[in-house]
């Protein structure tokens, strides 16, 4: 009954609880009215609050509105094969008072990805999520799959990715979801993934650069670069380069780059203010795992901003997001310090569904159509660090990334 639960039918709101003998109904065009069975009359105003309401958005995925022979509206849940006269959107009504000012944002840190997608149907949309076999990436992929999107889980370990696909299919057997191999630590693997993806001849409407590594001991990839830098930044940079033609053909399309608030606690320029490769991919003697992670997260925002500047004229936007503080996931398995900190902070952390919310919000919010080059935290735009806002550093990082790839593979494919 997962789809029914996600539709909101289990939710109640004590403030809007009706008196005995009253029933809440909706019209064909979404207006809420109230039936008083005791006095056999109807009215637009809630009998307790006096408010007028309407349902928000489309019906949840898998639902259809029909009318019976008496002209009464009813609803068919095709996923769970049930019929009801209760509009599933009634759990998400909004006040009919558009002129009343409000300072409350629609979503916040407690919002889940499923709540953001409630009532949305993404049939025909293709979503690619890297690192989607667990954690935030899995919740992002699952949320889209349960709302009709064709979702591709791009992961280093195909076996674990296939297990993640099975978990999604257990929730809804008709979900359109598949796994593909992508190792961001190997540039040739990124290239092979892009070739395999293009061979499918599908569109690409949302690309979520989610995969990442944290607290690794110093090491070099097969391409001769420090692992954290290549996995968290350069691999994603190359992936987007290879798929940018597909994104542009699929426009409007969106790229979401998962960064972190830790980007604020580092810098990647030398004393003269120039981008310094030795800070991005340091030798063993200068390596500190936490600093390497922070620098890669700064690269994420700079990359997202420059990507938006270059591709937005072609209908592709990009935004960077912070998923949440002290969220334990598989990327932290290498750090005993982080495990200890997480154990202490766990009562105050987000769930993985909440952690995926900002990513999903930036991927689907109608108010962000055509907008990008921004940084979001708790589904709200906020300013990143001053260095993350530097257009000069963003351009320099882009050019350096292109050179690093070209030096190893030759001219990038497209």
Swiss-Prot record:
Positions of region (Disordered): 1-24
Upregulating conditions: By hyaluronidase. Up-regulated in outer and inner nuclear layers during retinal degeneration.
PTM sites of type Phosphoserine: 14
Tagged with keyword Plastid: no
Ranges for domain WW: 16-49, 57-90
Any GO BP annotation: extrinsic apoptotic signaling pathway
Bilayer-crossing regions: none
Subcellular location: Cytoplasm; Nucleus; Mitochondrion; Golgi apparatus
Tissue-specific expression: Ubiquitous. In the brain, expressed in cortex, striatum, hippocampus and cerebellum (at protein level). Detected in embryonic skeleton, in cranofacial bones, vertebrae and limb bones. Detected in chondrocytes and osteoblasts.
Binding site for substrate: 260
Pfam families named among the record's database cross-references: adh_short, WW
Chain positions found as Phosphotyrosine: 33, 287
Residues annotated with Phosphothreonine modification: 12
Main location as per UniProt: cytoplasm
One Gene Ontology term, aspect cellular component: plasma membrane
Residues that bind NADP(+): 131-137
Any GO molecular function: enzyme binding
Record motif Nuclear localization signal, residues: 50-55
EC number(s) per entry: 1.1.1.-
Region (Mediates targeting to the mitochondria): 209-273
Active-site annotation: 293
Domain of life of the organism encoding this protein: Eukaryota
Function statement: Putative oxidoreductase. Acts as a tumor suppressor and plays a role in apoptosis. May function synergistically with p53/TP53 to control genotoxic stress-induced cell death. Plays a role in TGFB1 signaling and TGFB1-mediated cell death. Inhibits Wnt signaling, probably by sequestering DVL2 in the cytoplasm. May also play a role in tumor necrosis factor (TNF)-mediated cell death. Required for normal bone development.
Subunit record text: Interacts with TP53, p73/TP73 and MAPK8. Interacts with MAPT/TAU, RUNX2 and HYAL2. Forms a ternary complex with TP53 and MDM2. Interacts with ERBB4, LITAF and WBP1. Interacts with DVL1, DVL2 and DVL3. May interact with FAM189B and SCOTIN. Interacts with TNK2. Interacts with TMEM207. Interacts (via WW domain) with VOPP1.
Domains as described in the record: The WW 1 domain mediates interaction with TP73, TFAP2C, LITAF, WBP1 and probably TP53.
Name of the protein: WW domain-containing oxidoreductase
